[in-house]
Regions:
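Proteins that catalyze or organize thiol-disulfide redox chemistry
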Residues: 25-69, 76-92, 109-135, 139-218, ...
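C-terminal segment of classical bacterial N-terminal signal peptides
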Residues: 16-23
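General helical secondary-structure elements
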Residues: 1-2, 26
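Active-site-proximal cofactor/substrate-binding loop regions of enzyme domains
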Residues: 98
Length: 350
């Protein structure tokens, strides 16, 4: 809670005599630290596995019982982790499926416990997360009976998509196709309707190599028709003036991830939207892929993110912070701290 401001009458009078008046009050308000909102502590299910964190043993034990291991990275106060537990795992059929087919092992993104990877390498929790390039929480890694990652979810996805992920990764599923094709077969993307529009989207035809030549970063929004998550992104995040300002340094384009729309990639390749999405491994709608002014992919959003995290993604690339700080979570912390130091409240769940 913000400290109660006290402005003594004599100081107020002195400010007015000095010609400061209202600006003096405004300066004092700006000196206060803003609040950090939206953090929520999560009680993780008691049926998560209590592991010695030697993953080769965990994989073997799970395989012996006809299950697979899921490594679940979380962090303290993470509202997206809380959503996974309270919105997804709270649904009886999802909980039953998870418990029947998987041993879930929770790791703290910033934790110091000792872990041993499947190949025998020792790490702390946080170093293991860094080695795996975990940039978001929750991140879930589904391991097969040999310890190979068969599916990775980077961030929170809604219950329907989450359950499809469980079906794909469960023991014995043997889908015979990649997860992208599996999702397409399960969800049957609509061929009718239209994509959500936004004022910052460039009109086709798209030659993204031109943007790179002009030294401008590129933001590619892969979406689909009849997409509730896309609707939510546009309504609650992309329509916000601060989000629009954060996107303004970018050449932003919107692509139907299943369409045959022709384009030229930042690297100069002529391809269709569908073909490029497949090359990039885009599976979730909406996915936002951010490219530097050099044409290299820096980071992507392929899960549900609200305003603060979405705006931070664009700031991370446009401001060049990724060149000095490879850990996006640390960048988030630094950005929130800087905003609060200027007196702004930061709500990470808005």
């Amino acid at each position: 809670m913000k400290a109660i401001r006290r402005i003594a009458g004599s100081l107020t009078a002195a400010a007015y005599l000095a010609g400061g008046g209202l600006p003096a009050v405004a300066e004092e308000e700006r000196s206060e630290t803003g609040s950090l909102l939206g953090r929520v502590q999560t009680v993780y299910p008691e049926w998560f596995k209590e592991s010695f964190l030697e993953f080769a043993d965990d994989v073997q034990e799970a395989a012996d019982e006809g299950r697979r291991v899921v490594i679940f990275f979380h962090q303290d106060g993470c509202p997206y982790c809380n959503a996974l537990v309270e919105r997804n795992l709270s649904q009886k059929h999802i909980e039953e499926k998870m418990r029947r087919h998987f041993d879930v092992i929770a790791l703290n993104l910033r934790g110091d416990r000792d872990v041993v990877s499947v190949n025998g390498t020792a790490y702390s929790e946080k170093d293991f997360a860094r080695a795996l390039n975990v940039q978001f929480t929750p991140t879930l890694l589904f391991l097969d009976e040999s310890g190979k990652v068969v599916l990775r979810l980077n961030g929170y996805v809604p219950p329907e998509e989450f359950e499809i992920a469980l079906d794909y990764a469960e023991p014995g599923s043997e889908p015979g196709v990649g997860y992208r094709e599996y999702l397409e077969n399960r969800l049957r993307p609509s061929q009718t309707g239209s994509l959500n529009d936004a004022p910052f989207f460039d009109e086709p035809p798209h030659d993204l190599s031109d943007s790179i030549q002009s030294g401008k970063p590129v933001a590619v929004f892969f979406e689909q028709r009849d997409c509730p998550s896309c609707d939510t992104l546009h309504r609650e995040v992309l329509d916000d003036p601060q989000t629009i300002a954060a996107i303004s340094p970018f050449h932003a384009v919107q692509l139907d991830m299943w369409s045959d729309t022709a384009l030229v990639t930042p690297a100069g390749q002529e391809v269709t939207a569908r073909g490029w999405a497949e090359q990039l491994g885009v599976r979730y709608a909406p996915t936002i892929v951010l490219f530097s002014a050099d044409g290299d992919e820096v980071i992507r959003s392929e899960a549900v993110f609200k305003r603060f995290h979405t705006q931070s993604l664009f700031d991370y690339v446009a401001g060049g912070a990724y060149r000095q700080e490879s850990d996006f979570q640390r960048f988030l912390t630094d950005r929130a701290t800087a905003m609060r130091a200027q007196g702004q409240d930061v709500d990470i769940w808005k």
